[in-house]
Amino acid sequence: VNFYVRLQMGHGFRTNGEKVGWKNDVQGRERAYAAKDWCELPEKIMQAAERIRGVQIECRPAVDVIQRFNSPKVLIYVDPPYVLGTRHGKQYRCEMDDKDHEELIDVLLDHKGPVLLSGYDNALYNGRLRGWHREETVNYSQTASRKTEVLWMNFEPEDEEALNMIIPK
């Protein structure tokens, strides 16, 4: 419950102390801030509990977790802070520099199971993950700049249906 309350009452998406504002929308564009959502809280908590049943959550450096669970039966999905050169400014309490991204890639390349890695299109990942399957989507950042988001996979999705389960259209 505390987690859900923190999500709903958070000050924007950043966690580095930068002022981004209280969640609200006086123009009615975002139903996400409606009081009705609070009435649905018990149901949402039950849905979340069902969804994460059997999921193991670790609070350790990602590289350590990936190395510990290096097995063909373990799927790794990584959504790290995007490479600094692809975005405007620091946005996370725990940032990653290029050296950290290199270390992460080294560990992912050694992983025996399936890997999915999210990020903006960048030379570092493209160079190191040559041969991995890529799926691209074009989005616009908060500054309205065009960004290509990429999902790198160390496997080929079996078919279009499997791919749509990973990336809904």
Positions of predicted regions on the chain:
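Class I S-adenosyl-L-methionine
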Residues: 56, 60-75, 82-169
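SAM-dependent nucleic-acid methyltransferase catalytic core
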Residues: 1-77, 81-89, 122, 163
